[in-house]
Amino acid sequence: MGQKINPLGFRLGTTQSHHSFWFAKPKNFSIGLQEDERIRNCIKDYVKKNKKISSGFEGIAYIGIQKRIDFIQVIIYIGFPNLLIEGRTRGVEELQMNVQKEFHSVNRRLNIAITRIEKPYGQPNILAEYIALQLKNRVSFRKAMKKAIELTEQTGTKGIQVQIAGRIDGKEIARVEWIREGRVPLQTIRAKIDHCSHTVRTIYGILGIKIWIFVNQE
């Protein structure tokens, strides 16, 4: 039976790069890793609390962290920055202060920058959030998957695969449903593939969403 490997970890160093970039002594590595996790969780919690109610989702593709001895640079790659910044002139400063408090760092400066992604629906995290929102609003899972694929095709990707697992449409027995459009060569290491796993809590229980997007081949 074929073993499933995470396509991002499988391609690290070839088509994928790390979202955290820093060096540490082996004994301090776990501390640095926990710091990164705290920073990311703090940012996501802040965005969740301050996002527009009407939008329903955060739109964060990923958070990049670069560390030096006395400085930490955090870059938030977001699809819809207006959801976070609009109507709030000090949005980024407030977020920076929140993270700094959580971080308890005296000797290191922290800087947060927001980078807008040109084609947000080409990012699997944003697409998974979109599908999750549709499922919460009781839209048919097939309709949600097809609409997500239509949105992705507009960004010029070469292929996409969407998978939803769990008690779909409230059925007694959990099952897996998936749909693919175009090519998704998971076995080819030089193929640049973006992937994400996302969970959504519906009235019937938790559903798992997985998305693979074939961007291009190097």
From Swiss-Prot:
Pfam family, one: Ribosomal_S3_C
KH type-2 domain span: 43-118
GO cellular component, one term: chloroplast
Example of a GO biological process term: translation
One GO MF term attached to the UniProt entry: structural constituent of ribosome
Keyword Ribonucleoprotein: yes
Domain of life of the organism encoding this protein: Eukaryota
UniProt KW Nucleus keyword: no
Family under the similarity heading: Belongs to the universal ribosomal protein uS3 family.
Subunit relationships: Part of the 30S ribosomal subunit.
Name the UniProt record assigns to this protein: Small ribosomal subunit protein uS3c
Species whose genome carries this gene: Phalaenopsis aphrodite subsp. formosana (Moth orchid)
Taxonomic path: Eukaryota, Viridiplantae, Streptophyta, Embryophyta, Tracheophyta
